[in-house]
Amino acid sequence: MPKDEFTVEPIEGLPERPPSGELILWQGRPSKLALARDALGLYWVAGYFVLLALWRIGVSSASMPVSEALPLGLPFIILGAATCLVLFAIAWVLASTTVYTITTARVAMRIGAALTVTLNLPFSRILSADLAVGSDGSGTVVFQTAGDVRLSYLVLWPHVRPWHVRLTCPALRSIPDAANVAKIFAEAAETRIGQPEIEARDFDAVAAQ
């Protein structure tokens, strides 16, 4: 399944050219901001530091004027901004080094910044898929693979269903226009082997799982 990739890709995102008759239907990568939000908790971190700043200002304003207490919250805002910048930089690297591919026969995921691997998932090894779409249209397509397929959560992260360590489910994470990508996958899989089950689920519920 995963294979190290040390050679030049003949086609971006694929370690070798598809066999005769296999066509590329879609290629894409995660949205950088959506990946930072969904996988790295960017908004939660930002909110945490804002609350710290408000708490510091609130406590200090009990013993001094609010105008003097306001600057005391500034260090938390600066630290929070720096932390969010680091998280976004990590998401930028992860997204930039990722290429997802859907062909007429499989889903391929070229992932990894330091160690690049390519995961090939033939439609015959995909039991079902879940679709989670956010308000901005970006979302995640999660694949449940056959029981004999063993995948490493750490190697695939963040391209997995969050927190499902024992039963790792690979995912096309934080992709733009996720509903359309899921439709492309479903139609291709139906043509190949019969339609797999695609369940539309609440985005926050899937992200929390």
Positions of predicted regions on the chain:
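Membrane-proximal intrinsically disordered regions of secretory-pathway and membrane-system proteins
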Residues: 1-7, 22, 118, 129, ...
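Short, charged cytosolic
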Residues: 2-28
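Long, distal/terminal scaffolding or interaction modules
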Residues: 20, 47-51, 120
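Residue-level signature of catalytic and energy-coupling elements of molecular machines
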Residues: 26, 107, 181
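Alpha-helical transmembrane spans
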Residues: 33-97
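Conserved beta-hairpin
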Residues: 83-128
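Acidic, Ser/Thr-rich low-complexity segments on the non-lumenal side of membrane proteins
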Residues: 111-151
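A membrane-cytosol interface segment of integral membrane proteins
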Residues: 135-209
